[in-house]
Amino acid sequence: MKILIVGSDLNAFLLAKYIKIQDSSHDIYLTTEETCVDESYTPIHIRENDVPSICDFVKYNQIEFTIATSQLAIINGIADIFKKEGFPIFAPFSEAARITFFNSIAKKIMYKLKINTPKFGIFDRENLALEYVRRSRFPIVIENDFNLLSRESTIYKTYSEAKLGLQKVFENGNEKIVIENYIETEPLYIYFITDGFNALPLVTIERTSGENFSVSASPSNKITENILVKILKQAIYPLLDDISKFAGGYTGIIGLKVKLVKDTFAILEFYNGFQYYDFQTFISLSEENIVDILYSAANGSLADDYDFIQHKEDFSYTVAVNKTEVLDYLEDTDFIQSEDSEKLIFTNTASTMTYAKNILLDYIQDVCTKDVYSRIIQAESKKELRI
């Protein structure tokens, strides 16, 4: 199959490599400014937001399936144009994806559908936001509304701190902000694949972050089958049904940042596609053919083709470290390894989380600075104490 991946982010490169590993017969093309450094794909020098040129490339080169990881391409309507042309594509319509780009839209929809989310306020004027903060119980969270690549989210414990934070957010050119109550539990991350009507869970992840590093562990033992069913029934399916009425449906991968509150959940925000280095975690555990899954969702036949997504009976542990902290990078290891412009990412899988974690941390100790290794150990120790 001729496959075009629209994106030049880490997920795009990982996806191309993973597809080729699973089935070397695929011809893979990737939109990137870089010259080809990997035999798994052919580079196509088209800008991600130049959707008409991408469409022409697909037409004239008889591309059979397109996968968009690029946020720029999605917000510029690549799925809308491809659907009109009759080209198979795995990506949400631009209007549907707005719930992942604009937190204010996500919050309003959750409020309308009675989906659990922290109490919030949406403001486009600093004086009104300041008055809301003055009457709030602390701590609170202040974040910018628009999120293309990352959302700035800051926790404030006092009014004076929040006042300065508000000034900074509005001075940075944000036209709208979201203020919400802070929930004193660790965030968890859940990803679903959907064809716009049905959805299946892909992976659950716990994350710890610190100076120059982040650590991810999957699956999360905090997200039980009962919680997953609740999220599907009370959040995902009502959301998909609502989106289908005004935006044509959401086909793609939708991520949730959630916090658990007693025996239920609260959704903080939605993600379009995998965030951080979570795709690497997913591929380390999945036993499914990735092209088959995505193509099934793109065709609207997810429920017909899959009852669930098959995973290994393993645990995955991922460490992302700033390149400045790496002393001796060994390419020939048993770990899944990747890199972006700033970080090296290492993933290990094993039959138990303890084994996956200890083996990888031994490796991190050998190849990274003592400082970052110590910070990782301290962060993991604190997490265990909280448990």
For each of these PLM feature ranges, what is it?
Residues 1-93:
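ATP-binding N-terminal substructure of ATP-dependent carboxylate-amine bond-forming enzymes
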Residues 43-53, 121-125, 155-157:
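Short acidic-hydrophobic, aromatic-tinged amphipathic segments that line or gate anion-handling sites
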Residues 58-63, 135-136, 173:
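Glycine-rich phosphate-binding loop signature in dinucleotide/nucleotide-binding domains
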Residues 90-153, 159:
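A conserved helix-loop-beta module that forms one wall/lid of the active-site cleft
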Residues 152-275:
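Internal nucleotide-binding/catalytic subdomain
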Residues 232-255, 271-330:
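Active-site "cap" helix and flanking loop/linker of ATP-utilizing ligase/carboxylase catalytic domains
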Residues 295-387:
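Peripheral (often C-terminal) accessory segments that flank ATP-dependent C-N-forming ligase machineries
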